[in-house]
Amino acid sequence: MRRDLRTVFATVVVAVAGVLVVSTLLQGWDRALTAEGGAIELTGLAVFALGGVLVAWQMPAHAWRRWWPIPAIFVLFCLRELDVHDAFFTPGLLQTRIFTSPVPIWQKAVSALAMGGILLTLVLIVTRGIGPLGRALWQGRGWAWSVVIGVVMAIASVLVDGADRQLAAIGVTLPGAESRVWTAIEELLELGFALSLLLAVCIWDRTGWPRHGVNATRSGNKVREPQHPIP
């Protein structure tokens, strides 16, 4: 199973690289790497979507109740790539300014529910996943290190995002070309984040999903399974 998924990951990497190279040759690097709806954004969306599908496919029935936030987070990443946070309402479904804007109360309620759902997903990912992730890192599991590398890339992309605006605040103005370079770097980091998560999914052992609070019956005796076994 893992060997097949590693082949899938290698195929995805080759396909992504091919799309970016062809798009750069046809449209120029600035459009391919920085334009809204450009090649790099679309490939990132496809990678997140594939990661979510593979997680849902691999997750056994007993794990869904506790670990549903994992496929859910991939869905949220896809929605972010589609700019859903700025859609539907003015100033945007997930913009906090909506609570002080003159919009119908039901729109504020929908936004509050959406933000609450996202916050719940993130909290559950952290509180339920930090233990297994930490133990997997200690044991040198590749999927755990892939997740950490991806998170580092995501943090770096946030820091790079809007570098021109941040520098302008202290009196430094970047030429247009340099501004596009920073945008391209941000997009590449986000794509690296998506690929790192996909790699983690592809090298994760399907049999290693933690059983939380489940008793396994073996030879007529009830044996308490570890809550967080690491594959």
Residue ranges and their predicted role:
Residues 6-21, 69, 149-152:
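Alpha-helical transmembrane segments
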Residues 14, 43-58, 110-125, 188-204:
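Hydrophobic cores of alpha-helical transmembrane segments in multi-pass inner/ER membrane proteins
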Residues 22-32, 90, 127-129, 161-174:
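Juxtamembrane "helix-exit" motif on the non-cytosolic side of transmembrane helices
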Residues 34-42, 97-112, 176-188:
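Short aromatic-rich membrane-water interface segments that cap or initiate transmembrane helices
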Residues 76-88, 152-165:
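C-terminal TM-helix exit segments that contain a strictly Trp-centered aromatic cap at the helix terminus
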Residues 82-138:
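Membrane-proximal helix-loop-helix units in multi-pass membrane proteins
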Residues 130-152:
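Membrane-helix boundary/juxtamembrane motif in polytopic membrane proteins
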Residues 154-229:
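C-terminal transmembrane-bundle signature of multipass membrane proteins
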